């Protein structure tokens, strides 16, 4: 990893055919429920030698069971991490669980869910960054 690469990546996940909007304005975003940190967007740290896009897709698959298409990166919101807008097929709509001890549930939210380790403002600002 070079100094220009992130330490972690996060995925702002929306559904195919659904506009990416501000929270509460029509679109929905995928969140995972961590046992200690509560609701958050999927993501994690890069493994040794891993490219940020590889880490993004690996974390998305591990934490949600989904694969998606990378639309764009925001490389400036967090000083040590990148946030990607990822689109997944529209058929995924109901809450579900995955075989990951760090994820209790996976769910679409059209408002910022109850958060513990994050702030409502973070998710509202990210929604503005990625909105159409």
Where are the regions that the model predicts?
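Conserved N-terminal beta-strand and adjoining loop/helix that marks the start
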Residues: 1-29, 78
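Short, acidic/hydrophobic/Gly-rich beta-strand patch recurrent on exposed beta strands
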Residues: 31-33
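Residue-level signal for short, function-critical loop segments
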Residues: 35, 45
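A short, flexible beta-alpha/helix-coil linker loop
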Residues: 36-39, 114
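A short gly/proline-enriched turn/hairpin at secondary-structure junctions
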Residues: 40-44
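Unchanged
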Residues: 46-131
């Amino acid at each position: 990893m070079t100094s220009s690469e992130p330490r972690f990546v996060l995925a702002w996940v929306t559904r195919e055919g659904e506009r990416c909007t501000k929270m509460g304005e029509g679109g929905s975003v995928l969140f995972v429920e961590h046992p200690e940190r509560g609701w958050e967007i999927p993501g994690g740290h890069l493994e040794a030698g891993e490219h940020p896009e590889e880490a993004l897709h690996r974390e998305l698959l591990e934490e949600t069971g989904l694969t998606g298409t990378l639309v764009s990166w925001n490389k400036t919101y967090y000083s040590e991490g990148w946030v990607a807008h990822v689109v997944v097929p529209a058929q995924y709509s109901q809450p579900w669980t995955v075989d990951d001890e760090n994820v209790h549930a996976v769910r679409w939210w059209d408002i910022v869910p109850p958060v513990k380790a994050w702030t409502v403002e973070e998710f509202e600002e990210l929604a503005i960054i990625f909105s159409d």
